[in-house]
């Protein structure tokens, strides 16, 4: 099995695995292996997954629909680890397995990305990044994106420095480009109805997730991300009415989750509402244009 492990081809955020750097791996059989982060963060994330998976107050629908399935931890050969010793990895479902031409977006949620009781240097580092990106302004930032053009197979994948410098208008362009085919100005939003709209689309799933966050007081999800995934060919072939059924919306990255202590996670909820507004505006715009084209 170890010989089949490789860095995910479609990774858009985080550290990429190499001979001298630890990073996530996939096995081609539907599993994703995430090396434990250094210090307490990795152990904290593994403990969160174990507790969350068994928590009786988490609705099974929420756990199954919006969180990766947890398969425990496993030591894997890791040349990049100290002394080349086997290194512990969290084992999860590969969220993009089964998508031949995956289009991915990683959106970090929350205007504040550090948990309470964080050391001052870490707070300063997070605060600087939140202010120089759209996190502080919008309550979320796009950390990575990859779009495959279903017609020709060309891949659009802006680098991190490009995403880091965008403003609210830039976020709107990226979210539009994520559901465009690349024709014309590259912002035709031709796949918006299939990906963002409809019963199984991103917008409907985000609204369902929002309903849970309006009630849940178990956890506060600092620096967690929402991952969108869809297959370019399936979306292009979907009916224009929207909702191809293959769109995936998942929460990831839980190294900084804190106890909710009976309080709503307003930081995450606020960012989620902001993201819903941006995507809802795109769906409304596309719907209005389709109506005017047929009138």
From Swiss-Prot:
Reactions performed catalytically: 1D-myo-inositol 1,4,5-trisphosphate + 2 ATP = 1D-myo-inositol 1,3,4,5,6-pentakisphosphate + 2 ADP + 2 H(+); 1D-myo-inositol 1,3,4,6-tetrakisphosphate + ATP = 1D-myo-inositol 1,3,4,5,6-pentakisphosphate + ADP + H(+)
This entry's Enzyme Commission designation comes to 2.7.1.140, 2.7.1.151
- Please tell me which top-level EC class this enzyme sits in: transferase
Entry GO terms, CC = cytoplasm; nucleus
Gene from which the chain derives: IPK2
**What Pfam families does the record point to?**
IPK (PF03770)
Name the UniProt key words of this record, in alphabetical order: ATP-binding, Kinase, Nucleotide-binding, Transferase
| Protein family per UniProt | Belongs to the inositol phosphokinase (IPK) family.
**Expression across tissues:** Highly expressed in anthers and at lower levels in roots, leaves, flowers and embryos.
Q: Name one GO biological process term.
A: inositol phosphate biosynthetic process
Database matches in InterPro entries:
IPK, IPK_sf
Q: What does this protein do?
A: Inositol phosphate kinase with a broad substrate specificity.
Q: Which residues form a coiled coil?
A: none
Q: Where are the transmembrane segments?
A: none
The protein here is known as Inositol polyphosphate multikinase IPK2
Region feature Disordered, mapped onto this chain: 1-21
Q: Name one GO molecular function term.
A: ATP binding
Glycoprotein listed as a keyword: no
């Amino acid at each position: 099995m170890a010989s089949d492990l490789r860095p995910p081809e479609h990774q858009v955020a985080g550290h990429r695995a190499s001979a001298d750097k630890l990073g996530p791996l996939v096995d081609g059989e539907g599993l994703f292996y995430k090396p434990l982060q250094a210090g307490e963060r990795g152990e904290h994330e593994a403990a969160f997954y174990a507790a969350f998976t068994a928590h009786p107050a988490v609705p099974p629908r929420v756990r199954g629909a919006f969180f990766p399935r947890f398969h425990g931890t496993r030591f894997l050969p890791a040349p990049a680890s100290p002394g080349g010793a086997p290194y512990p990895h969290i084992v999860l479902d590969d969220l993009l397995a089964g998508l031949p031409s995956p289009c991915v977006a990683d959106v970090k949620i929350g205007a504040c990305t550090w948990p309470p009781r964080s050391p001052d240097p870490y707070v300063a580092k997070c605060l600087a990044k939140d202010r120089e990106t759209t996190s502080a302004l919008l309550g979320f930032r796009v950390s990575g994106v990859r779009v495959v053009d279903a017609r020709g197979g060309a891949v659009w994948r802006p680098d991190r420095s490009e995403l880091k410098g965008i403003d609210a208008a830039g976020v709107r362009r990226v979210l539009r480009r994520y559901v465009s085919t690349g024709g014309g100005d590259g912002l035709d939003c031709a796949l918006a109805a299939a990906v963002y709209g409809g019963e199984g689309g991103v917008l409907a799933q985000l609204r369902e997730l929002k309903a849970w966050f309006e009630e849940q007081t178990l956890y506060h999800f600092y620096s967690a991300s929402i991952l969108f995934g869809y297959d370019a060919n399936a979306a292009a072939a979907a009916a224009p009415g929207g909702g191809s059924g293959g769109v995936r919306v998942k929460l990831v990255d839980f190294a900084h989750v804190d106890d909710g202590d009976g309080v709503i996670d307003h930081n995450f909820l606020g960012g989620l509402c902001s993201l819903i507004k941006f995507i809802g505006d795109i769906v409304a715009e596309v719907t209005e244009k389709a109506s005017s084209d047929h009138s």
